[in-house]
Swiss-Prot record:
Protein name: DNA-directed RNA polymerase subunit omega
Function in brief: Promotes RNA polymerase assembly. Latches the N- and C-terminal regions of the beta' subunit thereby facilitating its interaction with the beta and alpha subunits.
GO molecular function, one term: DNA-directed RNA polymerase activity
Transmembrane intervals: none
Protein species of origin: Edwardsiella ictaluri (strain 93-146)
Phylogenetic lineage: Bacteria, Pseudomonadati, Pseudomonadota, Gammaproteobacteria, Enterobacterales
């Protein structure tokens, strides 16, 4: 079983309440969003992986926001391209 001390993670994020929010958000991304962990898995659960990523400075709230915005922009661009292709096919 992995042992994680959250003190380092709290120091990276600022307070324990924000840490819970960021770690939960990242763990959810790994569980349901198909995102790969940025640290070796070592048979850990996603919550432990999220805390380890935060401790190592690989993830914080700003990083998650930027990544989500980029993914949303990529998805919107792909959708626009698909709609354009459909519209051009009807001409």
């Amino acid at each position: 079983m992995a042992r994680v001390t959250v003190q380092d993670a709290v120091e990276k994020i600022g307070n324990r309440f924000d840490l819970v929010l960021v770690a939960a958000r990242r763990a959810r991304q790994m569980q349901t969003g198909g995102k790969e962990p940025l640290v070796p898995e070592e048979n850990d659960k996603t919550t432990v992986l999220a805390l380890r990523e935060i401790e190592e400075g690989l993830i914080n709230n700003q990083i998650l926001d930027v990544r989500e915005r980029q993914e949303q922009q990529e998805q919107e661009a792909a959708e626009l391209q698909a709609v354009t292709a459909i519209a051009e096919g009807r001409r």
